[in-house]
A protein has these predicted regions:
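C-terminal catalytic domains of large/alpha subunits in multi-subunit enzymes
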Residues: 1-161
């Protein structure tokens, strides 16, 4: 089935992180994004959409959590307890693009913000897990907050002085 309105963007993402084994802090050293949204009608708007999608992916992977107790009661008090990255926490994005025209759109355009958001989350997560791969770690639950990463370091015994 090939409906006339089917369009989808795609991208590829690469993330390099440093993990402080004593504090659990994760610093994104480098993040590279290559996106394809078809015809680039307004490059400045596209860049903003990519930055926004990546920033939300960063927030989801690295800190956003809505905690509940065993009875399902929400434990957060306000958005002060919810990670909303500012320009201070947000990494510098290195972006590039390729163009594959969409045959179902008169201009060949596609969506843009979906790819960096959906692809960015596992990219951040895999970068953190990769930092522990030499110790046999193949999975870590998100978000990768400093507390969770510190607990992982502690469980592995790598943060002993």
């Amino acid at each position: 089935y090939d409906p006339p309105n089917l369009t989808f963007p795609f991208g590829a993402y690469l993330c390099v992180v440093d993990v402080d084994k004593f504090t659990g802090e994760v610093k994104v050293r480098r993040f590279y994004a290559l996106d394809d949204c078809g015809t680039r009608i307004n490059p400045m708007v596209i860049e903003g959409q990519i930055h926004g999608g990546l920033t939300e992916a960063f927030a989801v992977a690295m800190g956003q959590q809505i905690p509940f107790d065993e009875n399902g009661n929400h434990l957060g008090n306000s958005l002060m307890d919810y990670f909303l990255p500012t320009a201070v926490e947000t990494p510098k994005w290195e972006t590039d693009h390729t163009v594959t025209l969409c045959p179902h759109h008169p201009l060949g355009a596609k969506g843009v913000a979906e790819s960096p958001h959906v692809g960015g989350i596992p990219c951040f997560s895999n970068a953190v897990i990769d930092a522990f791969a030499h110790l046999g770690v193949t999975h870590m639950d998100m978000p990768h907050s400093a507390w969770r990463v510190w607990k992982q370091c502690n469980a592995l015994g790598v943060n002993k002085r």
